[in-house]
Structure formats: structure tokens, C-alpha cells
């Protein structure tokens, strides 16, 4: 399948950036260590807010190497992982095979997937992906189209302000070296009010928002009410829309 230049809502520099380090996706001490460390928090939040994942049809948009997708499959969900990076998907498929976990990995844009699979999923997750595409609002609209009436959609991204720049870029990339330099661009960060405005233009309705915090002194992540930097938004499809 030739996916190059298929859509304007793909940043090929972003794709190349993650493909270059895809082989280390499951290295717990490598570039993706923060994703491995926050994954239990993400999984717990999603599972709790969606009232469990067992037996549900789930789509993970921007799945990368499959960290979240695999963990949801282990919870008993029927998971499809969607990404535009060929190398991360290959890593994800191999790791799932080695781990004995079943996930259907697909190289396709979320917009194209929505055109073919409208209303198919009970749960859609879009984690740490919106800040890596040219048109994040288009992704929000596609996610809303993909979920069943009454289903759940989860977004996570980074707030756009001076504190987020200091912590997510200067702190995480240059001082603590938690993620590779160039991973983030503050111009692509998204304020909660912006994300909620995009959500309000769809049949989705906001249900809950939480911040994701890193404590430098304890070297631990936790969920909390402050959404100044990283945050997760739970929405559900309004059956009346």
C-alpha cells in the first residue's frame, strides 16, 4: 500500500522522526521510557471511565509501537491499532506476536479509516498524537465519526503555555533528556479550551478532564486536577446527536 503524500493531514517529518527510533520502542530504558511509565495511568483512566474494556471493540489512533494497544488487548478488548509509520507498526506486530497478544495493526490515516468504518468502535483512544499532525481538528472529527453512539473517545496532548514549554520541551528534552530533542514543538501544543471547542463541533461531549503530572523529586507520574502541561480528556458520543 503506497501511503506517501496520500493526505495533507500527515507530517512526513514527524513520521520519519519516530521511524528512526522505532526499533527501540519496547526498550524500557530507551527513548520511549516515559510512555512505558505513564501507560498504567493511561490504561487505568481509560478502563475506569469506559466502564471496562473486556469484550469491547477499541481503536487506538496513532498507536506507534503498540504500548497502549497491547495493554488494552490484555484487558480483553478487540483492538485495532492505527498509525502512518511503517516501522513502528512493524515493531508493534512483531512484539504482539512474541507476546501472544492479538492486535490488528493498520497503516492508514484516521480520516480514511473513518470513511470506511463509521460508528464501528465502542472506544477510541488518541493519545499523544494530536500535537504531531497538521490538522488536529480533523482527527477529532474522524474519531467522533468512528465511535458508536454512547461510546467513548479519549484524547491526550500537551497544553500550550510557558510552563508547558519549560517542562515538556526544555525540561524533558534538554535537561532531563527523558525524550529525544525535537520531539515536541510548542506551536503544535493544544490548549484544553481549543480541544473542547473542536469536540463541541462534533457529536462528542466532554465528560472529564485530568492532568498528568511528573514529580521530579519522587521520579513518579500521577493524575491530578492541574492541566497546565499534559492532560487527558474523556468524551462520549451523545446518542441524541
From Swiss-Prot:
Identify the residues that bind S-adenosyl-L-methionine.
42, 62, 83, 127
Where do the TM regions start and end? none
CDD domains in UniProt? AdoMet_MTases (cd02440)
Q: Which GO terms describe its molecular function?
A: 2-polyprenyl-6-hydroxyphenol methylase activity; 3-demethylubiquinol 3-O-methyltransferase activity; polyprenyldihydroxybenzoate methyltransferase activity
Q: What class of enzyme is it?
A: transferase
What is catalyzed by this enzyme?
a 3-demethylubiquinol + S-adenosyl-L-methionine = a ubiquinol + S-adenosyl-L-homocysteine + H(+); a 3-(all-trans-polyprenyl)benzene-1,2-diol + S-adenosyl-L-methionine = a 2-methoxy-6-(all-trans-polyprenyl)phenol + S-adenosyl-L-homocysteine + H(+)
- Entry EC no(s): 2.1.1.222, 2.1.1.64
Q: In which pathway does it act?
A: Cofactor biosynthesis; ubiquinone biosynthesis
Q: Keywords assigned by UniProt?
A: Methyltransferase, S-adenosyl-L-methionine, Transferase, Ubiquinone biosynthesis
Checking InterPro entries in the record gives:
SAM-dependent_MTases_sf, UbiG_MeTrfase
Give an example GO biological process: methylation
Q: Does the keyword Methyltransferase apply?
A: yes
Q: What does this protein do?
A: O-methyltransferase that catalyzes the 2 O-methylation steps in the ubiquinone biosynthetic pathway.
The record's annotation in NCBIfam families points to:
UbiG
Q: Which HAMAP family match?
A: UbiG
- Name the family: Belongs to the methyltransferase superfamily. UbiG/COQ3 family.
What name has this protein been given in UniProt? Answer: Ubiquinone biosynthesis O-methyltransferase
Q: Which organism is it from?
A: Pectobacterium atrosepticum (strain SCRI 1043 / ATCC BAA-672) (Erwinia carotovora subsp. atroseptica)
Lineage here is: Bacteria, Pseudomonadati, Pseudomonadota, Gammaproteobacteria, Enterobacterales
